[in-house]
Amino acid sequence: MSSDERQIAFFLDFENIALGVREKKKLRFDIDLMLQRLLEKGKILVKRAYGDWSRYKAYRQDLHTAAIELIEIPQRSYSGKNSADIRLVVDAMDLCYSKEHVDTFAIASGDSDFSPLVSKLRENAKYVIGLGVENSTSDLLVENCDEFIFYEDLIRSQKTPLKQHNIPAKKAEAFEVVISSIRALEREGKTAIWASMVKETVKRKKPSFAESHYGYSSFSKLLEEAENLKLLQLKRDERSGSYLISHLS
């Protein structure tokens, strides 16, 4: 494990996010967009979603496939709108105190009621990432988090740079996950991006990834072909012999 690899707990206030996305008439909530962005930052050790699942049956399978634990908060038990919020807060603070190795909490909600939770987590030296929907997220919540990611930005960041390169579909799949991982490292402010760092990020995003599946004897060979296709530029470190990614096309 890299020393800077975050150990993440993800908590999803599903109703808040689902309603926010529903207001964007052309959007359907895709949990994978959030999880993939978090996997660029580290390992997700805990994944929980809170809501009345009898009202959101259409989403249950996607959440189960993503290995998210569904916490049932029946609507009939609501005392106002805060029952799911209260359970999420209790679970997050319990995890904060009982699992010291979890250093990052990702809270998916736009509700200002979570601002005290964010403050308490930060008091306990936890890094807090917020995720929400534009125009339905509290400014107070955004300002309280160490980092805030809007769902619409996740959609906008989905790029398909390989269409114009006429690359076979199987190899394009490999290059796309590599390039998205390099962009993730750039977003995290990494000034030197080593091939090994890219490989670690790729494996978090796609645990089954193996360069041999795409016809390459090593990850370096895959990167070399990407350079030949002008997808990126490589620079070999003279001391270690390892590759640095110097530029993305």
Language-model segments: residues:
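Intrinsically disordered, low-complexity linkers and terminal tails enriched in Pro/Gly
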Residues: M1-D4, E152-A172
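Short, well-ordered beta-strand core segments
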Residues: L70, F105, V128, F148-I149
